[in-house]
Amino acid sequence: MQHPLYQQATYLKSAPDLSHCPEDFGYEVAFAGRSNAGKSSALNVITSQRGLAKTSKTPGRTQLINFFECDEQRKLVDLPGYGYAKVNVNTKRAWERSLSQYIEVRSSLKGLIMMVDSRMPPTEIDLMMLDWTLTLNLPVHILLTKSDKLKKGPAQNSLLKMRQLLNEKYPHATVQLFSSLKRQGLDEVWAKLDEWMEYERPVKSQPETKES
């Protein structure tokens, strides 16, 4: 199961800050989340490309803003993971500065896919991201990642709790369960990306039947 647009994603460039980003036009959707929430794995599954975004067992390896081009108008963007403590303080501040510059200034940014581990409640920094994007009026779609590690009941409970929080405080955000390992939730996240990218999938033509 592949998506006709996102399977075409190819690495474009990495930028340490806003001034090194590609030209600001078209449609971009950025992927954000805590450094161990499964962001790179999700990107690889969504694009059906195992090695597109580099995964690592060491959280915090994504230190640059990484751009992947789907077509001439549309890009996916892998943002630096936030909230990881075991990095140099100056490095951490530089990441946060480039992250905030990109999210606040980038006019082609149409939405944010945000990773939250389904096995635990959102952290303080996750909630700060939701508060921040709310003030910017930036749409957010949350992937409750690693949902395959939960049984069906606890997974649904995690989804309902997050949905209730969003309904009460964050009307700009939506949420779904997602598993990179089991490839669960792909259709839902593809539909959200299509909406933000203003992309219509080609309709497969039906073979003509001969009249008798």
Swiss-Prot record:
Q: Does the keyword Calcium apply?
A: no
| Annotated EngB-type G domain residues | 25-199
Q: Where do the TM regions start and end?
A: none
Question: Under the cellular component aspect of Gene Ontology, which terms does the record hold?
Answer: cytosol
Disulfide pairings: none
Stored SUPFAM superfamilies: P-loop containing nucleoside triphosphate hydrolases (SSF52540)
InterPro entries, sorted: G_ENGB_dom, GTP-bd, GTP-bd_ribosome_bio_YsxC, P-loop_NTPase
- The residues the record assigns to binding GTP are 33-40, 60-64, 78-81, 145-148, 178-180
Name the PROSITE patterns for this protein: G_ENGB
- Cofactor(s) it depends on: Mg(2+)
Q: Per the UniProt entry, what is one GO biological process?
A: division septum assembly
Which keywords does this Swiss-Prot/TrEMBL entry list?
Cell cycle, Cell division, GTP-binding, Magnesium, Metal-binding, Nucleotide-binding, Septation
Annotated GO molecular function terms are: GTP binding; metal ion binding
Record bears the keyword Aminoacyl-tRNA synthetase: no
Please list the residues that bind Mg(2+).
40, 62
Family label: Belongs to the TRAFAC class TrmE-Era-EngA-EngB-Septin-like GTPase superfamily. EngB GTPase family.
Q: Which HAMAP family match?
A: GTPase_EngB
What this chain does, per the entry, is described as:
Necessary for normal cell division and for the maintenance of normal septation.
What is this protein's name? Probable GTP-binding protein EngB
Identify the species of origin.
Answer: Hydrogenovibrio crunogenus (strain DSM 25203 / XCL-2)
Highest classification ranks of the organism: Bacteria, Pseudomonadati, Pseudomonadota, Gammaproteobacteria, Thiotrichales
